């Protein structure tokens, strides 16, 4: 009855591989990417506005890398849409920084990569599973038709509880968000195909 939480990079391919080699049902294999990326997005918004990160909600979908999709329309501060609180220019700078945050950490550390924030993200997921909290978290989930994707692990919001991925929450993506998500899916598929997992 265990749940496999994959945190190793390249995340998108490793979670697909983990599912294949484990033999576990798809709901019991989940990737961490979106939890970490969403936390970084939330942190950057909080720092820019000088507010507690606890009051910021945000989602980052898609692959774990340069093609991730921070959803600005779903970002709020105490329920207030972020676009009401800062300029589009600042928002786009935060989106760009979110996409490059992993590289930023590597550059600052000089050796190795991030370890504290991924550990905290994995802990957040494990706690939701072990305590059956049913948290809504952005995780790499195997999609079977949701978001128009079949048979591929991609970062999307899900309910995470004792059963692992208890359900995928399907958002209606439009315009640039839909286009960016579809491009991210293409990138994830290419990575999975390249690594032959």
What are these regions (language model features)?
Residues 1-42:
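Rossmann-like NAD(P)(H) cofactor-binding subdomain of soluble oxidoreductases
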Residues 22-28, 36-197:
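C-terminal substrate-binding/catalytic lobe of Rossmann-fold NAD(P)-dependent dehydrogenases
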């Amino acid at each position: 009855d265990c749940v496999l939480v994959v945190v190793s990079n390249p995340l998108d391919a490793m979670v697909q591989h983990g599912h294949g080699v484990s033999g576990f049902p798809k709901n019991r294999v989940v990737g961490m990417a979106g939890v970490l990326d969403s936390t970084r997005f939330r942190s950057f918004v909080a720092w820019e506005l000088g507010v507690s990160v606890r009051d910021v909600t945000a989602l980052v979908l898609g692959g774990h890398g340069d093609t991730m999709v921070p959803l600005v329309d779903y970002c709020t501060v105490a329920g207030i849409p972020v676009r009401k609180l800062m300029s589009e220019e600042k928002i786009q700078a935060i989106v760009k920084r979110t996409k490059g945050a992993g590289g930023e950490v590597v550059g600052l550390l000089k050796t190795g990569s991030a370890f504290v924030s991924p550990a905290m993200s994995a802990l957040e997921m494990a706690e939701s599973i072990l305590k059956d909290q049913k948290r809504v978290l952005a995780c790499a989930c195997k999609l079977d038709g949701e978001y128009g994707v079949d048979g591929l692990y991609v970062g999307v919001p899900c309910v995470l509880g004792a059963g692992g991925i208890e359900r995928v929450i399907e958002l209606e993506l439009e315009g640039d968000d839909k286009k960016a998500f579809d491009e991210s899916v293409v990138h994830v598929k290419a990575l999975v195909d390249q690594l032959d997992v």
